[in-house]
């Protein structure tokens, strides 16, 4: 920032680092699982990225698309109401930035564990994908499904999502960017959640022993899901 005082990107990058530091204190669990000291640290730390982002908004346009994403994370932390959060999201839609990470942030905000009601997040995922249409819409549907199912703390009803649409979304992602071990783990994880043993087995065979901690959290969960897939014929 000192070398490039007019750089929006530098400010957004700093805000990203700071808000992650704030969430380290809080964690991603439900509010009643957070200690008083963790809340204190979280509320103290989250103030600075908001201040930095507000300062970045005063710089000459255009705003970096990631600015909106980071501001939505601040909004989640600050408990913004639905109208204020949607205003940020709608500004991105109107600018036609094509930045699907905003969809991920908004879908996460709509989870019941945060500020949405049952069905809000899954309806948003469907509408977003339908608005794009085709393979181009299925791809973000896959990405949003990962967010909703993995961040729902085991309480998100997977049947709200369309497994038949998630799978072509994964294929569209692979076609555009190629496959990754993390993506393979994500599909195996969702196949387990949807109780699709056939797809789960295929992915576990590809994965081998290369389990992704960011997907499964611990090795025991990975082993349990793999054992389940291998023990079922359908």
Regions found by a protein language model. Give the residues of each.
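Alpha-helical tetratricopeptide repeat
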Residues: 12, 69, 184-185
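Intrinsically disordered, low-complexity segments enriched in Gly and acidic/Ser/Thr residues
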Residues: 149-202
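Short coil/turn motifs that N-cap or connect alpha-helices
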Residues: 10, 100-101, 180
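Short coil/linker segments at helix-helix boundaries
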Residues: 1-6, 16-133, 139-168, 206-233
């Amino acid at each position: 920032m000192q070398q490039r005082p007019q750089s929006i990107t530098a400010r957004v990058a700093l805000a990203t680092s700071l808000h992650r530091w704030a969430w380290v204190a809080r964690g991603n669990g439900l509010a009643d699982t957070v200690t008083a000291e963790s809340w204190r640290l979280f509320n103290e730390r989250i103030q600075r990225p908001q201040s930095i982002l507000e300062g970045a908004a005063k710089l000459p346009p255009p705003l970096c698309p990631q600015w909106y994403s980071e501001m939505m994370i601040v909004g989640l932390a600050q408990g913004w109401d639905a109208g204020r959060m949607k205003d940020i999201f709608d500004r991105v839609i109107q600018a036609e930035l094509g930045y699907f990470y905003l969809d991920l942030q908004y879908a996460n905000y709509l989870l019941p564990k945060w500020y949405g009601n049952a069905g809000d997040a899954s309806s948003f995922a469907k509408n977003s994908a339908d608005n794009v249409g085709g393979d181009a819409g299925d791809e973000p549907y896959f990405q949003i499904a990962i967010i909703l199912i993995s961040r729902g703390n085991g309480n998100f009803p997977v049947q709200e999502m369309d497994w038949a649409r998630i799978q072509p979304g994964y294929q569209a992602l692979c076609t555009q960017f190629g496959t990754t071990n993390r993506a393979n783990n994500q599909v195996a994880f969702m196949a387990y959640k949807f109780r699709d043993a056939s797809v789960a087995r295929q992915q576990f065979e590809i994965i081998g022993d290369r389990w992704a901690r960011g997907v499964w959290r611990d090795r025991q969960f990975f082993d349990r899901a793999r054992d389940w897939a291998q023990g079922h014929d359908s």
